[in-house]
Amino acid sequence: MKFKKLEISEKVIQRLTEYLWILKDVQKYENEINSIELSKIMNTTSAQVRKDLSTFGDFGVRGKGYDISKLIEIIEDILGINKVNNVIIVGHGKMGEMISSNRNVLGKGFQIVGIFDKDKNKIGKVVSDNLEIRDVNDVKEFRENFCGEVDTAILAVVKEQAQFAAEQLVKNGIKAILNMTTYKLELGSDITVVNIDISAKLQELNFWRLNKEEK
């Protein structure tokens, strides 16, 4: 299911992913849920829940709510995780190794099909799921010979190498990058980049911890 990027805010997509894991948890003991119940778990308003979901269609039944199983299927379809999406990791340092060795981090709908690094001492080594670490310069050849689409990369190199590595990935056909570095990438508007900065999230968490009103 595809939508025009300008029509949907990043916040809506972020909440959509939260709805999904909440629904999967609630599904263990309930078959249906309404917007009020979902909003309480999400700590938002029922109006916000209805607005978010109505962005993609009319899925609920007035006075009854949502069939949880069906809503999960719909959200997975919207997020494109109702099928397997191939992903490569570029940079097999501590972060890259952590991701490649713990597939649960990726969740449903994603599989690592290639790992790349520029360190000659790492190239050729076989790691998780019998994947061989390849030379980062071989990304284009790998994509061309792989049986299936590979246009998403997890960038886990050191900050100083991030921009150059990202540019090379784009040049070799990568269209979407999960940026695990703390460097703000400057790429074309046709390239999708999502930044994951753990330190920034900890800073955000710490602010709210320090400024949380006592009840």
What is each model feature region?
Residues 100-102, 127-128, 165:
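A short secondary-structure junction signal
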